[in-house]
């Protein structure tokens, strides 16, 4: 899933990728 990569690659972009919160706390 690209969402997982985004969250891991850009954990600082939480506001842009709220899914990253669930994937990478």
From Swiss-Prot:
Keywords: Blood coagulation, Hemostasis, Heparin-binding, Protease inhibitor, Secreted, Serine protease inhibitor
Localization annotation: Secreted, Extracellular space
Tissues where this protein is expressed: Plasma.
Keyword Cytoplasm: no
Record carries keyword Magnesium: no
One Gene Ontology cellular component annotation held by this UniProt entry: extracellular region
Modification(s) after translation: Phosphorylated by FAM20C in the extracellular medium.
GO annotation terms (biological process): blood coagulation
Molecular function GO terms recorded: heparin binding; serine-type endopeptidase inhibitor activity
Subunit structure: Forms protease inhibiting heterodimer with TMPRSS7.
Similarity annotation: Belongs to the serpin family.
Biological role: Most important serine protease inhibitor in plasma that regulates the blood coagulation cascade. AT-III inhibits thrombin, matriptase-3/TMPRSS7, as well as factors IXa, Xa and XIa. Its inhibitory activity is greatly enhanced in the presence of heparin.
Record's protein name: Antithrombin-III
Organism the protein comes from: Mesocricetus auratus
Gene: SERPINC1
């Amino acid at each position: 899933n690209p969402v997982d990569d985004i969250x891991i690659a850009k954990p600082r972009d939480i506001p842009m990728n709220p899914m990253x919160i669930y994937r990478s706390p």
